[in-house]
């Protein structure tokens, strides 16, 4: 069974995602669509709109066949680490191809950029850092450097838009890992990431949809019908994360002091002081981010740093986990066709597949050996995923007493597509 891989957040699953899913199957000639999806905290440094099980349910009801979770260290990371972790998960599952959306839609142009960044990586990093110190923003600085090195006009290089940037990192990850997955890209339809407008086919950006939900507006026409029901249920039960709760939890962590903050991942010299100063007076989450942000770091980078603080992510450990790569595959759900694929691909799978967390410790011990470094890192990676679920539950106003150790009680979803 030919399988196409999709790297996703589904925050939430909307009409643009449905287009991407269907176009990816067609482009790759695939019978099965396999999604690796972020868990409770996302690449841009924010909690997901819906918990990972509801988002997996939306995906499966809308036609995805397999959903596996991207572990926290990669889900809430910079684009290169996010891309590499996701590519490694799909490769370990035995997926044949990878199809991603991009503003460019030009695979050749994206591959040329990926090759340039691989071959001239040190030069790009050094020159970009120089421009950042002069006050230029990161995306513009990297585009200018790549234009200078390639001899192209910066405006012709697809390095500004978010999906192009991720696409280039997926291509770099394929090269770096030696993956045999064949890449495809399809053009994004409708609104860009930061655009609140609705495009043809009722396609809006995920951020635009979240803004509408926050303002109490209806979004039914922007989502496939099966996703509408899932979002409506979470909305009625007050299970969207609350920014005020997020802000208060972050303040409690920041008030532990600068020595503590300096032990955490990406809390660099100077940021710890800005954090403690901002925590003393900030009125809400957005004000906290605004007060900490400095020119050389993007807003997204600051938000990710705050998620590391919330989840107590130690610097030395995170560096080791990112270097190791994903050490298990957490199955969130599958369709009948997806289960057939997983069974057929079992012998090709290169990482342990976790379906029951009550048995994961013995499963990891058998796979890696009880005294191995990989076993130690796998347990640490698992603990971060479990911590993310516990902390996410603290952000939900309507949490009703379901165990915060929910990871141990949720079996993989078994769902037929509804469309």
Curated annotation (Swiss-Prot):
GO biological process: tRNA modification
Catalytic EC class: ligase
InterPro entries, A to Z: Rossmann-like_a/b/a_fold, tRNA(Met)_cyd_acetate_ligase
Pfam families given in the database record: HIGH_NTase1
One term of GO molecular function: ligase activity, forming carbon-nitrogen bonds
Keywords carried by this UniProt record: ATP-binding, Cytoplasm, Ligase, Nucleotide-binding, RNA-binding, tRNA processing, tRNA-binding
Reactions performed catalytically: cytidine(34) in elongator tRNA(Met) + acetate + ATP = N(4)-acetylcytidine(34) in elongator tRNA(Met) + AMP + diphosphate
EC numbers, comma separated: 6.3.4.-
Record bears the keyword Endoplasmic reticulum: no
GO cellular component annotations of the record: cytoplasm
Domain of life: Bacteria
Binding site for ATP: 7-20, 101, 163, 188
Compartmental location: Cytoplasm
UniProt KW tRNA-binding keyword: yes
Entry's family note: Belongs to the TmcAL family.
PANTHER family reported for this sequence: TRNA(MET) CYTIDINE ACETATE LIGASE
Task performed by this protein: Catalyzes the formation of N(4)-acetylcytidine (ac(4)C) at the wobble position of elongator tRNA(Met), using acetate and ATP as substrates. First activates an acetate ion to form acetyladenylate (Ac-AMP) and then transfers the acetyl group to tRNA to form ac(4)C34.
UniProt-recorded name of the protein: tRNA(Met) cytidine acetate ligase
Species, as recorded: Syntrophotalea carbinolica (strain DSM 2380 / NBRC 103641 / GraBd1) (Pelobacter carbinolicus)
Gene from which the chain derives: tmcAL
